[in-house]
């Protein structure tokens, strides 16, 4: 497990988070990539942040969990960058993504957030 992964997210919960990202991509607003995700967290506009566990070097996303904690934003870990990229509508992987406006996935994001807070 990478240094920056603070807790294990069950596979079904990670899948739910990826589904919510897909729905938010189509009906709301998402930010893709580490830089855009970092800005969304700093501005406090992110509702849910997804970070891949297979990022190398780890330093690329190492700051995200701490920053999200400071801002009170829920963060979920998923296995691969490719999963995040695909859910965000990219043809390549993405180390991180943020849901800004969940759109039709609003209740899903609320459920995911509650479940992740229980894990911590």
From Swiss-Prot:
Purpose: Multifunctional RNA-binding protein that recognizes the K-turn motif in ribosomal RNA, the RNA component of RNase P, box H/ACA, box C/D and box C'/D' sRNAs.
Organism: Haloquadratum walsbyi (strain DSM 16790 / HBSQ001)
Subcellular location: Cytoplasm
GO molecular function terms listed in the Swiss-Prot or TrEMBL record: ribonuclease P activity; rRNA binding; structural constituent of ribosome
Record-stated family: Belongs to the eukaryotic ribosomal protein eL8 family.
RNA-binding as UniProt keyword: yes
Quaternary structure annotation from Swiss-Prot or TrEMBL: Part of the 50S ribosomal subunit. Probably part of the RNase P complex.
TM annotation in the entry: none
NCBIfam families, sorted: eL8_ribo (TIGR03677)
One GO location term (cellular component): cytoplasm
Coiled-coil intervals: none
One protein family per Pfam: Ribosomal_L7Ae
Keywords: Cytoplasm, Ribonucleoprotein, Ribosomal protein, RNA-binding, rRNA-binding, tRNA processing
GO biological process: translation; tRNA 5'-leader removal
Encoding gene (name): rpl7ae
InterPro entries: Ribosomal_eL30-like_sf (IPR029064), Ribosomal_eL8/eL30/eS12/Gad45 (IPR004038), Ribosomal_eL8/Nhp2 (IPR018492), Ribosomal_eL8_arc (IPR022481)
Record Gene3D superfamilies: 3.30.1330.30
Protein name: Large ribosomal subunit protein eL8
């Amino acid at each position: 497990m990478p240094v920056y992964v603070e807790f294990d997210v069950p596979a079904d919960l990670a899948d739910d988070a990826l589904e919510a990202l897909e729905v938010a991509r189509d009906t709301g607003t998402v930010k893709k990539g580490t830089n855009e995700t970092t800005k969304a967290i700093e501005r406090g506009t992110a509702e849910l942040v997804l970070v891949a566990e297979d990022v190398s070097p780890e330093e690329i996303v190492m700051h995200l969990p701490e920053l999200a904690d400071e801002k009170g934003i829920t963060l979920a870990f998923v296995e691969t960058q490719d999963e995040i990229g695909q859910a965000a509508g990219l043809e390549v992987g993405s180390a991180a993504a943020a849901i800004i406006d969940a759109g039709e996935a609003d209740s899903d994001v609320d459920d995911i957030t509650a479940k992740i807070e229980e894990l911590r």
